[in-house]
Amino acid sequence: RDRRPRRPREDRPITPSVPKERELIPVSEAGMQQAEKLATDFVTGLLAKMGVEGQVKTLPQVECDQLRLEISGPDMGPIIGRRGDTLDAIQYLGSLVLNNALDEHVRLSVDTENYREKRAESLERLARKMAMKVVKAHRSMTLEPMNPYERRIIHAALQDFNGVTTYSTGTEPGRRVVIAPDNSYRNRDRG
């Protein structure tokens, strides 16, 4: 069979795909109160079993389906873990407990010592630094394995960075972000 390249149909314009924004489904006040008690009790119990002294408090909601918890105490290093792995595990387990017990879906965010914001800033700096290396060397660079939240930070930080494109490769838990030269930008630059 003849395999010639297909020509685009002229009656159908080619438009770039735009990612759909996640639809926020508000959680009822009663549901949020129940979620707050469940999550706080779960995380407090987990801290006790870990032998870590800490208090759990609720932070103000940012989005209508999100419950934010802050853990505070004298030594939060064991709670954060290596690159936030322990904190991510606490958040994941808390989410499972919440969403198995409730009729409504609640997104749980657990933080301590403002770790998540500091980590996001660190990842954004790393993304820009690596992107500049990619532009200079005209070679792709693959970052260390990251969780979906951290990969999203890298992609967002570089979406408007001229000369590079990003994509993820591999399978969980070893999925990585690749920062690659954007050839369309390079060709535009030359011509």
What residue spans do the PLM features occupy?
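Intrinsically disordered, low-complexity glycine/proline-rich and charged
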Residues: R1, G163, T171-I179
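Intrinsically disordered, low-complexity RNA-associated tracts
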Residues: R1-Q33, K37, Y185-G191
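Short hinge/gating elements
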Residues: R22-M32, P74-I80, S109-E117, H138-E144
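Short, highly charged
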Residues: A30-R107
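P-loop/Walker A NTP-binding module and the surrounding RecA-like catalytic core of P-loop NTPases
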Residues: V56, S95-N100, V106-R107, E117, ...
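Conserved nucleotide-binding/hydrolysis micro-motifs of P-loop NTPases
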Residues: V62-C64, M76, D85, D103, ...
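A generic structural signal for beta-strand entry/edge sites
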Residues: C64-Q66, S140, G174-R176
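A short beta-strand motif that forms the metal-chelation/ATP-contact edge
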Residues: Q66-S72, I154-A156, V177-P181
